[in-house]
């Protein structure tokens, strides 16, 4: 198996994978906080999770070149995780449109129904980048599971950091708990990445690349974790929010770099542009 080195599937695809995971994670985490009291939830925060995924989808569409390629690729859902991702994102965004209309019309019952349905679609959107990025044919099953856990946790932690950043402007009342959730998920990501990296050997070139890739997330996440810890002990809400905002940007940068490294590390079979559109 040769490493995945195609430059055309670099920044745009990595951005889509990052935003898909972050937007769906943000929705799942935020909705879970207010699942029993939706009347206290911020519509802007709920809809932000859909907006982030929509931006990611624009990155993917710009990569595909022409709009009709979107539908051509979607037909290939049986054999392509990227094609499945297009379908999952579309269902999730349609649900988000329904929630936006329900908020505009004041249909509280419909908001609850579509909100719960959105959790299912968000879970599918969250799984899509994990499954695409971890798809390695020549790494043992338990190691594939380990890489999936790291990718999943990094997506969840990115979603949590975005909530902490947005809460500063949209819902300051949840700033502290969003920082605490971010700290917990970043710690879990660092632990999982360290354990997975230490399980890899140095003899095989693929394992050396994998080790380097999974270690790349350690520095930015550690800096972000330190800043969040500093924010927790700050007594001034404005300073706490400012530190959390900086920590969020650093964590997002680390997540994007991690995905760029995954796309170039050879951890999964190469994506061939023509394969995306085969019927």
What kind of region is each of these model predictions?
Residues 26-33, 38-91, 95:
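Membrane helical hairpin/interfacial module
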Residues 58-61, 83-85, 131, 257-265:
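Juxtamembrane membrane-interface segments at transmembrane alpha-helix termini
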Residues 43-50, 240, 245-248:
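Short, 15-30-residue, compositionally biased linear elements
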Residues 65-72, 133, 137-139, 202, ...:
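Juxtamembrane/interfacial segments flanking transmembrane helices
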């Amino acid at each position: 198996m040769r490493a995945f080195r195609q430059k055309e599937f670099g920044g745009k695809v990595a951005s889509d994978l990052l935003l898909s995971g972050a937007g769906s994670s943000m929705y799942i985490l935020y909705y879970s906080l207010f699942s029993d009291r939706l009347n206290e939830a911020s519509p802007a925060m709920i809809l932000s999770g859909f907006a982030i995924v929509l931006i990611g989808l624009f990155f993917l569409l710009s990569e595909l070149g022409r709009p009709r390629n979107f539908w051509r690729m979607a037909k290939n859902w049986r054999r392509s995780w990227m094609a499945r991702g297009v379908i999952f994102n579309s269902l999730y965004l349609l649900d988000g449109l329904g929630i936006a209309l329900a908020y505009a019309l004041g249909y509280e019952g419909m908001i609850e129904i579509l909100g719960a349905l959105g959790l299912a679609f968000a879970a599918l959107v969250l799984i899509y980048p994990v499954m695409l990025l971890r798809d390695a044919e020549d790494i043992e099953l338990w190691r594939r599971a380990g890489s999936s856990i790291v990718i999943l946790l990094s997506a969840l932690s990115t979603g949590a950091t975005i909530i902490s950043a947005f809460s500063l402007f949209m819902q300051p009342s949840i700033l502290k708990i969003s920082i605490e959730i971010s700290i917990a998920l970043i710690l879990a990501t660092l632990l999982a990445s360290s354990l997975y990296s230490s399980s890899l050997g140095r003899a095989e070139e693929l394992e050396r690349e994998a080790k380097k890739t999974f270690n790349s997330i350690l520095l930015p996440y550690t800096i972000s974790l330190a800043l969040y810890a500093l924010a927790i002990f700050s007594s001034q809400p404005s300073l706490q929010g400012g530190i959390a905002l900086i920590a969020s940007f650093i964590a997002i940068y680390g997540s994007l770099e991690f995905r760029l490294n995954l796309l170039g590390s050879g951890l999964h079979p190469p994506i061939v542009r023509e394969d995306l559109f085969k019927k």
